[in-house]
Amino acid sequence: MSENNEFQSVTESTTAPTTSNPYGPNPADYLSNVKNFQLIDSTLREGEQFANAFFDTEKKIEIARALDDFGVDYIELTSPVASEQSRKDCEAICKLGLKAKILTHIRCHMDDARVAVETGVDGVDVVIGTSKFLRQYSHGKDMNYIAKSAVEVIEFVKSKGIEIRFSSEDSFRSDLVDLLNIYKTVDKIGVNRVGIADTVGCANPRQVYELIRTLKSVVSCDIECHFHNDTGCAIANAYTALEGGARLIDVSVLGIGERNGITPLGGLMARMIVAAPDYVRSKYKLHKIRDIENLVADAVEVNIPFNNPITGFCAFTHKAGIHAKAILANPSTYEILDPHDFGMKRYIHFANRLTGWNAIKSRVDQLNLNLTDDQIKEVTAKIKKLGDVRPLNIDDVDSIIKDFHAELSTPLLKPVNKGTDDDNIDISNGHVSKKAKVTK
């Protein structure tokens, strides 16, 4: 203290430091829409192109209602010129009064546009191939023809008071100058958004980011992105597109679509809740993902993949002893996703030779038995020994524990643990099976 007995000033800040989400958007990405994105669900358009898919009218309506309840912003439907029933289904879904806007996906052709605007849709998604592959082997038109057709269709759809998106097809194998010229042309006449499509799944995140940033410099409208998953980059590409400034992402339930599909709805939600938790939790009913995936899986006769983000049957299961110990102390040690956000539970898989004594101790507590730590370590060794010989199940482990306990002179029971609301880890291991369908 100074001689004049004055108080010294406090130089350090007394306010709590502001912490940023380390898994969120990079602050340098000033165009990022990671916290302001929209979803266009294409299960009833792209998903219909999945090899196993056949959705009758009733099933389409059921899926559309489920997606609307989940909170998607748009629902995209098969072109009404694809078949007579496709047109009728489009009209039927438009009459449901859903909160989500209804889109249909058409070729860049006036014949398609005239039919589309009569169905009652809120918007029309127009697409035409721009790569040399598609111009030569698909529609056979040059860029001048594409630009002229695009302007004609866009102006017609706009005259009907309907949203319009123009997208190139096979964007990442198209000439960049051609792409930017066509996008500038359609932006000038007032499209609601332009679309980038990785039609063959060839793009990587760095290419996506660079193209989106370049496109943002030449158009003022929103950017929509459609990523196929042929090389396994669909989720990463979608996230990177949002970082670069795209706003809308095409998804489908379980990623179903042409070949091995597109960005999956559930998988993207897993990525986005880590990056923008408040936005995602407030906008989407995440606990509905499991039901929607089961609905679509049943409709197309597939199982939920075991390694599916969120709903794979092992998504929140912990097996190794080191992992189990840490999870029992603090789930964040080995989980970036909270299963409760999705209406799921976490499990400790203790019936195996990799188990640790902390997991067995938790099981002993559940069985209301009284063992010391040293005794638990001893019984754990017995469990691991049998686990070296054959696969174990919960009954095997419980029998070993109970037999061990019966041989001791300690009290048979300890006071019953009534539990608390914080008991959120199930170590029963009962859900682990070879069945890949997630059930409640």
UniProtKB/Swiss-Prot annotation:
GO terms for biological process: lysine biosynthetic process via aminoadipic acid. Its EC number is 2.3.3.14. Pathway: Amino-acid biosynthesis; L-lysine biosynthesis via AAA pathway; L-alpha-aminoadipate from 2-oxoglutarate: step 1/5. The active site is at H323. Residues 37-290 form the Pyruvate carboxyltransferase domain. InterPro entries: 2-IPM_HCS-like, AIPM/Hcit_synth_CS, Aldolase_TIM, DRE_TIM_HCS_fun_bact, Homocitrate_synth, LeuA/HCS_post-cat, PYR_CT. Present with 21900 molecules/cell in log phase SD medium. Belongs to the alpha-IPM synthase/homocitrate synthase family. Homocitrate synthase LYS20/LYS21 subfamily. PANTHER family: HOMOCITRATE SYNTHASE, CYTOSOLIC ISOZYME-RELATED, HOMOCITRATE SYNTHASE-RELATED. This is Homocitrate synthase, mitochondrial.
